[in-house]
Amino acid sequence: MYGTFPSRLLFHRLESMVATIRVLLVDDDSLVRQILSRMLASYPELDVVGQAATGEEAVSRVEELSPQVVVMDIRMPKMDGIAAAREIKQRYPQVQIIGLSEYGNGYNADAMLKAGAVAVFHKSKSPEELYPAIMKAGGDNSTASA
């Protein structure tokens, strides 16, 4: 005889079957962080574990939160995203970094990739375009630019 299967247990089992990618958002603009956080929260495979406003804060948050992927602005006051990416990759080589740029300057994108980022996205792109890049970064170490 089949008994009823509690929906809560079913939900918990399904939820535990979905692999999650831990993401840290880094941008000196709190509105950008807020928009990205809300957008990424709609994907059950992604877990935004924290945010940071500076490169220095990003480095310490990586140590504290152990994200798999860091989505980071390139231009920030004090320690920029390029220097922070170098520091993070030196200390935590397994962490994947995706750069965000609001400038059309290819130098910044190239410098970010050389610092260890696996991709660089222009901030004018739809935040939804970031999702596949985060999924890819969370799963491998290949390099891409958009």
Describe these PLM feature segments.
Residues 107, 125-135:
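C-terminal output helix
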Residues 81, 112-118:
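As written
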Residues 77, 105:
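The feature encodes the CheY-like receiver
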Residues 19-32, 36-40:
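Conserved acidic segment of CheY-like receiver
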Residues 54-57, 80-83:
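Acidic catalytic/metal-coordinating carboxylates
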Residues 65-71:
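Active-site beta3 strand of CheY-like receiver
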Residues 45-53, 61:
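Short hydrophobic/Thr-rich beta-strand motif most characteristic of the beta2 strand and flanking loop
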